[in-house]
Amino acid sequence: MSVSRFVVRHSLMSVWLVLLAACGSGSSAGGTGTPAPGGGTPPTTPEVPQPEPPAPTASIGSCEATGAARTAERLARMRPGTLGQFVVSFDGKAGVTPAQKALLQTLPVRGAYTLNRLPIAGIVATREAAQKLMATPGVRSLRFNDPVTLDDEAANVLTSVTRAQAQTALVNADGQPYTGKGISILVNDSGIDGTHRDLQFGGKLLQNALGHLNGLGDVVGINPNLPIENVPNTDVLGSHGSHVAGIAAGDGTASAGLFTGSAKGASLIGYGSGAALFVLDTLGGFDYAMQILDTHPEYNLRIVTNSFGNTGDVGTCFDPADPTNIATKALSDRGVIVVFSAGNSGSGPDTITGNFKKAPWVLAAANAEKSGLLAPSSSRGSLARGSYFTDVDGERLIVNDRPTVVTPGTNYISARAVAADPFTPLDTEADISSGAIPLELIPFYTQKTGTSMAAPHLAGLVALLLEANPALTWREIKPIFEKTATNMPGYEPWEVGAGMANVEAALAMALSLRRDYGVPNHTQRGFFASIALGESTVTPVSVAFAPAGAVEPVSFEVGADDSLVLAQWTQPEGNACTCAIVLTDPDGNRYGSSIALPVLGATVATSAPARAGIWQFSVSGIGSLSGVSLDPLGVTNGIAGPGTVDATLTVFKTGTTQGLADIRGRSDQTTIEFAVAKRLVDGLPAGFTPDALLTRRQLAEYLMAFGVRQTREPSQAKRYTDTTGFAAAVADAVTAPGQLLMDLSPEALPPLAPASNGKFNPAGTVSRQQAAFALVQAIGRQALTAQYEGMDLFAFDAEGNTVPVADAADVDPALRNHVQDAIALGILDVQLSQQGGATVARINPKGTVSRAAYAGLATRAYNSIPFPE
């Protein structure tokens, strides 16, 4: 062990001991209720007992599916007699019947593929035949066979797989950690390379089938779906499916266990359609899954993972008659869990790529970066319609228009298909330059990014739960993931669903070791204070993009009473501009969308918190591919064809507020409102009560917003004698080590410490130095604070010069590094004054924190988080 590492570890232990000592009473460490910096009135005594948060408000609306109407409109635009490719769904539960095949033969249908176990067929027919078929009794729906696109060791730590497999209470009957053993996952993708040692055909890979339905355009006559089985390598055109398979269940053989899937013990089944996918191809995968259930029950197929989407199907309502929904419902009815990627069309609302990803029985994964934050390209749900009812098979269900949870999907290291990846030269260059993969392993592994990678990780987590409790269905698994998920700082449910998946807690629920998870999660509780979005204005904008030369942005103004800015563009068919749209705020912060690809109806969007001033809307091309710059000299506007981007800008006003009447007119009103809007703080039943003292119970509650996992002891042992219910849940979470989303170290200290003698002291107050430590720790800066070891405390004057901290002696020595970091980041405010002709700073470290003051501290901590652009 090096000397420097010993110093850091010794310092961390000292921090823990001082926190224990500092929290032994109901007051702050040495604090006597001294006035807040600036000489204001001392805060009042806190209210006790602390109220439980309100129940979540149920706002269930309605949403009319438009799939049939959109199909009719597209048919009307076709020329008479023109052939098209369509997917027709019949009434019924089994495969296409002889009578239904006979119906197709009576129409001018040139050719068809019929599925074997689903009442669905792909047809090539004229416009007139399609229109007639839509109106025929017994036909549930007809849709175009549109193209779909693939939604391209930190990961297992982020979702607590590593912790779960080290938890002695979470083991199977043999005393081994859950790895998905005995569960099979079907990968419905481009294919799987079963010659890869992590995905060995005949071992890990039980069956590998090659689909052929992408040949619909050439088919003549009525033909059954006959995938070719026992193909060792079906991933011959893309490597996407092999990478996905490795994320779900790769066993790490080629890397001696370094790169494994989230369910490394699970088995795999492959269904490959090649790199070019259409709706019918993916339906063939679902049909094959139904076949496996009938012909190979010994495989125990329980999960189908899908990493594709339809960018022409964004912002739409869930459609029960959509053929994909018919297929996934049939699988769900037989106990199969269906997982989808949310899509890569973010960062604006209404960008989930397919109404079928919103099905009540489907789990949709958003994409997290390794920092624990949401990837900008990850598709988001709807602002306008959060939840609504739908009727399916005689049952009323609720649709949530948002991802289910978030799982890692950025720069994910997994299996590389041998000699199959068209981007191998670029991928290899990026893999070498990243340094994340040992050079000798680059022939076998590569990095890819997207919700394509997040979905199989979630599928693997599902396998862990099913091994633990095979009786679970989607009706139990989906709520378990939502109740146990980790809040993500500043994000709303329409963006991240319930937050980051937490499989350690999910396993405890699946095993019925704990049933009390959920209350700290923002989707499972209500709030006393809230700020709604108000009215919006929509403005069309147009930018002519050229690969080189000047591209003029559009300037527009945002007012002080605005709260959110959105931009959205739907790329017309034939537009060569493979571009991203970008919003730039008055401070120069950029908010970009993903790239619009040349497929039918590609839609991209981006959003940003409003800042008063002049904004710019601009367009850019592709800057890099697989991490390699395509324009290293910077002489272009990005790689893209010329084209006009006709987008819309939507600016929302700040709407009505609830529970904040007592902050009106205060100088810190805007700060408190920001903290409330981001769920960094909440009000109380009587109002926000800004001048009341912040309690330890309130601090524990509010720290959960910064990504503290709500993991608790599986044994249900009561940790503190003075907490129950909600207070116990948050106290358990914020005092447990290694539970920070933004610090993956298992040695990460908890933001708060217990009091003493098995007590949490929920009504105790909080000092400024304790709040500074908690916030710096929560945003994942423990390792960075070591840079201040042995230094005197300093602050900055108005010119940026360093000045000494006059009351540094009042800071607990073991907290100094965190306090210094809080000062340097601007989290902890300072008072500058003259002393002996020199400027000095004071921080009042032992002063108690009011609720209003904490809102300011939390807001500044939030603004210190390096959110990805």
Indicate where each model-derived feature is located.
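Subtilisin-like serine protease catalytic core
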Residues: 170-281, 297-302, 333-335, 357-362, ...
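Substrate-binding/access-modulating region of protease and related hydrolase catalytic domains
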Residues: 95-99, 251-255, 273-361, 371, ...
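Primarily auto-inhibitory N-terminal propeptides
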Residues: 37-121, 127-134, 140-143, 148
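N-terminal propeptides
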Residues: 520, 648-869
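N-terminal domain-start motif of subtilase-like serine proteases
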Residues: 56-83, 110-113, 124-131, 150-187, ...
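C-terminal subdomain of the subtilisin-like protease fold in secreted/lumenal serine endopeptidases
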Residues: 62-65, 73-77, 301-305, 437-448, ...
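Autoinhibitory propeptides
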Residues: 98-175, 181, 200-201, 360, ...
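Extracellular S/T/G-rich loop segment that most often corresponds to the catalytic His/Ser-adjacent loop
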Residues: 189, 210-219, 357-459
